[in-house]
Amino acid sequence: MAQKGNIGVTTENIFPVIKKFLYSDHEIFLREMVSNAVDATQKLKTLAERGDFKGELGDLTVRVSLDTDKGTLTISDRGIGMTEEEINKYINQIAFSGVTDFLDKYKDNANAIIGHFGLGFYSSFMVSKKVDIITRSYKEGAKAIKWSCDGSPEFEIEDAEKDDRGSDIVLHIDDDCKEFLEKQKIEELLNKYCKFMAVPVAFGKKTEWKDGKQQETDEDNIINNVEPLWTKTPSTLKDEDYKSFYRTLYPMQDEPLFWIHLNVDYPFNLTGILYFPRIKSNIELQRNKIQLYCNQVFVTDQVEGIVPEFLTLLHGVIDSPDIPLNVSRSYLQSDANVKKISKYITKKVADRLAAIFKENRKDYEEKWDDLKIFIHYGMLSQDDFYDRAKDFALLKDVDGKYFTYEEYQTLIKDNQTDKEGNLVYLYANDKEGEYSYIEAAKAKGYSVLLLDGQLDNPMVSMLEQKLEKTRFSRVDADIVDRLIQKEDKKESELAKDEKDNLEQTFRSQLPKMEKTEFYVDVQALGDQTLPVLITQSEYMRRMKEASKFQAGMAFYAQMPDTFNLVLNSDHPLIKQVLEDGKTACATELQPVESELKGLEARLAALHQSQNGKKQEEISQEEKDDVKNTESALEEQRTKKNNIIATYAAGNKVVHQLIDLALLQNGMLKGAALDSFLKRSVDLIK
């Protein structure tokens, strides 16, 4: 005779609440159902091993089956089953209080509700309008029981027919969840959540191509590997085993660089395998590739807070029963066990890298370009990892040679120490684009590093802070003699007027480029140095680069790129431009410059006469005199600049020198490049 009753909850109806708060994550019901079946099976195996179960274990496969006609999804096991008393204890009594407060607290975290109070079974009501449990305990003399509930607090228990031990959970799928009656959808979820569960899980039969179509065979379609690689002893495994397992996890990925097998049982339980993949150009696309398991049951691939931030770029599997999986992420990040696990993983990764570096440096160097993004990310984000990694982090020069930090300091300290005692690390970001600057530095006997990685620029800033009396400078940040200044710079012998005229000659002909500004500077660089070159301020360039990644630096992002056009006043070509300008502009410039000198003298005298007077003591006539003189000065300066600009516009050498400097920096393109080529031919004729 059927028995009816109410499920023991302190709220009127738990099921609408479950549906409301868990609907966004409703697919996990299948994980919970299959996981429960696996648990029941493993408990039976444990009882058998202890001698508490004397019967035959037989086939222990957990079976998942669909009946689209009846609209049901069934999960069956041959585990320990349940008696009527156990159903009352584990199914009918949801023993907790303060449910409303709890739901308010965790309403944004679906997983916090399931599991926290053992509600795994009740996740089935997220997709079901009715759930039946047909079960028979393994205990001798136990009878089969059927429990039914339609999602209200009421349930019904009655005798059932079931010859074998175990449980069948029959889910009558809700009308708005019909996708869970599709074979492809169930296969997808089983592969996602159950592919490494510890008991075989079957879904249908395997198929083969026969008589021109796919036909079912008699062989079960087992969807999981009950002994995944991370559960095995590392000493029994070969490299190919690890590579094969990686291909199983990530079929479309390139072969990993290497891997770390985690296996610890104290002070916490943790197993797993972490792979170092070959990182492509976009770091963000690499994240969320570590899969987190609890006793071989997939939980999530959102592992922030469990795995150190920089190691979220790794691939692989972590399995631990000691991580509280069904709580909020903020709780995870403050959990003592999680912190220990995070530190342990960091240490294991550092130890593995150090061992590879020590045992096979050649192989390590060959993999460095792929490895460095992990190492740099870790050094930038965690001080404890920096302290470990500084001994195996490498620097690579433009010739492809690798050095540890200590080795490189020893290499350059004699020749690359400036007059202030700073060790200067010269570097290039683009070996081809900065070639002439690199060669100029090498001609001085300097070593140049190649820093072309995604995180090399922030690494430079960090190393300047970590290493004492150390400065990094890109090879195009200044002329080579000033990159590492060993003595006071030589001043140009040109008079101020000559420098001003020379600067205006070139400034007037510089191209107008969007969000780009040029400044002209005259320096005495020696007659063997190039006549013209372009440099870019190390500080401003770094600030603009940092603004792409760091919040609060939008000011620098909006600023134009600034470049310095450096004129070598010692070079014959620059001297020629200056002398030609004097000759060509003498007649026009003489009266203008004479007028300028007179106006400058007059303005100086006016300022002198007003010196020491309060503003109200200066007459309007005196103020007007100053204003008119300043206006006349500006007019004459503009006139002078126009005369020089007219001369410069017709001087092919000026244009050729500017274009050569732009070409050297990859800034000469399109019509400007075409004009340069034609002019070059004319000059050769």
Regions from the PLM with identified roles:
Residues M1-F180, E188, K195, K343, ...:
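GHKL (Bergerat-fold) ATPase N-terminal catalytic module, capturing the glycine-rich phosphate-binding loop
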